[in-house]
Amino acid sequence: MDDTYNKLPDEIWLEIINFSNEKNLLFTNKSFFELFDFMKVEEDIIECIIKYNLLHILAYIISLGGPESFIIKKNIITTESLNRHFKMSCEKGQYTIVTYLVALGADFRIDNDYGLIHAAKNGHIGVVKYLVSKGVNIGANDNCAIKFASENGHLEVVEYLVSKGADINANNNYPIEMASKNGHLKVVEYLVSLGVDIRANDDYVVGLAYYYDHHEVVDYLVSQGAVLNKSKYSSSYNAFILLPVEIWIKIVNHTQEIGLLLTNRSFFELLSLINIKVDIIEYISNNNLTDVLKYLVFLKSINHPFCRFIRYSSLDDYLVKSCCEGDLSIIKDLILLGASERKAVMLACQNGHLEIIRYFVSQGFNIKCGSNCAVTIASENGHIEVVRYLISLGADINSGNNYAIKYASENGHLEVVKYLVDQGANIRANNDRAVRFASRKGHLEVVKYLVSKGANIRAKDDRAVTLASQNGHLEVVKYLVSQGTDIKAGDDYAVRWASRNGHLEVVKYLISQGANIKADDDYAVRWASLNGHLEVVKFLVNQNADIRAINNYAVRWAHKNKHFDVVEYLISQGAVINPT
């Protein structure tokens, strides 16, 4: 940029850029970078930086303080943008960009370690190593990382993941099965060297290799002891080329191995001539035949009679799987085939897949449908970026008697709880259910926050402390007591149910605070005995509980439930098992 432009005052630069809408002009000189603080930025800054390969700008933002810099704190660069581009960069193996985005605050564990799984899937060893060094879970999503790396033949990634503890037998030998299916001999050899059982599932590994014409893999597996049953696995090449149509129809009708036809579109029409007993959508899903799925979409678009074989219940099952994995391409195809669009959005909210939600919103989906279920589900599962996005579109967080904050509190999602409160959620709704259910689940920080915002811990006869006691959450109990809760409420419900459920430390604490263990005819010792909690029983006896209350109820029910150690102890203390 020449001196003429450099000498322009800031206000002229702002006018030029706001008029031209060319925000990337600011990236051309670090001295102009601060102008972002004075502008209304609508573009995705990270997208612009990556598009023009301005990695030095990312480095500069990091030097400004990374997550603490004004450009992050003022939401000029959003968390959603950082996370979205982090995932895409992991998929593409853009190592430097990945490290910079993490330094700026991207969540490297977002969506159940999406970054690691897709870096491994695409063979990006540098990104994989970096993410592992940051502490991702290599076993996330049922060891998807090693499964996908094996499936796609990325030996170096497979070796590295194994060195870090990945399960080579994940999902019933999925890694070697998919490596064999796709002809990745080196990966197969490596997995065999580690002791994978190549004969598992009735020699399925060698059968797959044979079926897909990977003869080198077949020869190797046979040399290692695998047994190939050629009558069970027909070679796709020879069978399709040599057999006449009428024989193929007979074979498939007899074996119900519809995969023999699904591997080649030129034979797909034969399916309409076959008496299919196998669920075709389930088969496509289980075997990851996405190209066949797309062909089904085409057949449906022309009203092909074969579409009568599609079972809608199976479409929804496949939809659940795809939404969990965040695979938008498959989801689109399933919707076109008749799967529920609403279910797809709710599953995306449940699993935190913001891109999927954005897509359906762009297609006109009403995020307020079903009493604002979308924002409730996202809140329940702690997906803060999804919650923010839905609220920005007008989702009603108070719908359904404030279910959003109740479920977020119950599941311990403090960040979501705070955001919902900032947006006007009513923490007192439904008799202070939020604090009651946070107490029940033991989420101390959520309880403290709700109390700081005015939640009533004594609602519903001090239900918060009784639920915390019932479930053994000692620290929550202590905190609630410090805030003035009545541990004797409900005829000493707290100590009775803590005893009933075997929470010894809670029982001890409650008694130290004045709880009455003899309440309700010595309920505490009776039910501790009935449920076999010996240490609780001993402690209560030492505190003078009456073990003979209600006609020796304690020992009789301990005996009935076969808690013989409790029976022996109670008898030693004077209980009578068969009172006259």
Curated annotation (Swiss-Prot):
Organism superkingdom: Viruses
Record flagged with keyword Repeat: yes
Pfam families, alphabetized: Ank (PF00023), Ank_2 (PF12796)
ANK repeat ranges per the UniProt record: 81-110, 111-140, 141-170, 172-200, 202-230, 314-339, 340-369, 370-399, 400-429, 431-459, 461-489, 490-519, 521-549, 551-579
SMART domains found in the cross-reference section: ANK
UniProt keywords, alphabetically: ANK repeat, Repeat
This protein's name: Putative ankyrin repeat protein L63
Protein's organism: Acanthamoeba polyphaga mimivirus (APMV)
